[in-house]
Design a protein with these regions (language model features):
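Metal-dependent phosphoester/phosphodiester hydrolase catalytic core
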Residues: 1-215
Length: 215
């Protein structure tokens, strides 16, 4: 046992091995910097939240013990790795809780994926009360963050209008939803979707597993 709530699991064998990594982004987290924008100023720049990126690189999101643990996990063999974060990893401009409030920690995560040569990483997140997919080329290969939320709570009307330069075209859904990742081992493809309460996909993004490798 250890402080915080984080862990990992391995599913499948050999060429169909999946690793699921659950991160704790709250227990060890240092305080966030709050912005001082008025509601109108937020609207003008596309922000909806209360926070802003810090310049204090001594602050931590995961805590050093969890970082050490994560490095060990990413070195384990797996074809697909699903990293679960309660807050968005890629998108950072909204002013909401996200990895981008500590830019040095966000950068550290991307660098750790590269340094450990961890292939097949896909990020999943929630918290924002709508669904979207963000993509960045800041990692060793294209990184995708599929965000889904919530199952039983409608979004605030302004939140889906928040800025996100990383959002893939067509990959935004406003309404109760859940995320779905389907792995097709025959075609070696990941299918990332957000589904409505009837289970109908509202957007789909296919990703070749072969594209998620450190060169």
């Amino acid at each position: 046992t250890h402080p915080g709530i984080y862990g990992s699991s391995i599913l499948g064998e050999a060429d169909q091995r999946i690793q699921i990594i659950l991160l704790d982004t709250r227990y060890f987290r240092d305080d966030l910097d709050r912005n001082t924008l008025t509601d109108q100023e937020k609207k003008d720049v596309g922000k909806v939240g209360w926070y802003q990126p810090t310049t204090d690189t001594s602050r931590t999101l995961l805590g050093e013990p969890q970082w050490v643990w994560l490095k060990t996990q990413l070195r384990k063999p797996a074809k697909v790795r699903i990293i679960v974060s309660s807050i968005q990893t890629i998108s950072w401009e909204k002013g909401m809780e996200c990895w981008g409030n500590m830019p040095h920690q966000r950068t550290r995560l991307f660098k750790l994926i590269a340094d450990t040569k961890a292939q097949g990483v896909v990020l999943i997140s929630g918290d924002v009360h709508f669904a979207e997919i963000s993509k960045t080329d800041e990692g060793p290969y294209p990184l995708y963050d599929i965000t889904s939320s919530g199952l039983a709570q409608k979004p605030h009307p302004s939140w889906p209008k928040a800025i996100n330069q990383y959002r893939l075209p067509g990959c935004l859904y406003v309404g109760e939803n859940f995320g779905l990742i389907t792995i097709d081992w025959a075609t070696k493809t990941l299918c990332l979707q957000a589904c409505d309460v009837q289970g109908q996909p509202q957007f789909t993004q296919n990703v070749a597993i072969s594209a998620l490798k450190v060169k």
